[in-house]
Amino acid sequence: MRAVIQRVKNAKVEVEGKTVGKIENGLLVLLGVGKDDNKEDIKYLAEKIINLRIFDDENGKMNLSLLDINGELLIVSQFTLYGDCRKGRRPSYSESAPPDIAKKLYEEFVNACKNYNLKVETGEFGAHMQVSLVNDGPVTLLLDSKKVF
């Protein structure tokens, strides 16, 4: 399971011109599900994201987590995080989970994050979405539950 995490002042996701998810101070998570992912990947990544100390404390040092600041979370599915561009000019998505499995694991990930009693908003799985955000910092991180990078 892969995630691009962006610390944001605000973010929203729209489908067909309608806002389906919107947050203020918190994290935008673009989430990709791989073909070998399972519940352990969900547990690892949810815990890691919720507890990452990437928000400024009173001294301006990144020392606080999403929980510490009572931040919000916007989770958007993005299978293209498994795009392999090493051969040719068209990405291969053979490492992505099939849509039915990916949707199930995506929903389980969202529920795992909701267990932390934070505001959690989402995009619409499989839809063509427009994501808008104000990146704070900017702070952008890449995570992989298999620790590939």
UniProtKB/Swiss-Prot annotation:
Function noted in UniProt: An aminoacyl-tRNA editing enzyme that deacylates mischarged D-aminoacyl-tRNAs. Also deacylates mischarged glycyl-tRNA(Ala), protecting cells against glycine mischarging by AlaRS. Acts via tRNA-based rather than protein-based catalysis; rejects L-amino acids rather than detecting D-amino acids in the active site. By recycling D-aminoacyl-tRNA to D-amino acids and free tRNA molecules, this enzyme counteracts the toxicity associated with the formation of D-aminoacyl-tRNA entities in vivo and helps enforce protein L-homochirality.
UniProt-recorded name of the protein: D-aminoacyl-tRNA deacylase
GO biological process entries: D-amino acid catabolic process
Membership in a protein family: Belongs to the DTD family.
Signal sequence residues: none
Motif (Gly-cisPro motif, important for rejection of L-amino acids): 137-138
InterPro entries: Daa-tRNA_deacyls_DTD, DTD-like_sf
Known catalytic reactions: glycyl-tRNA(Ala) + H2O = tRNA(Ala) + glycine + H(+); a D-aminoacyl-tRNA + H2O = a tRNA + a D-alpha-amino acid + H(+)
Domain of life, source organism: Bacteria
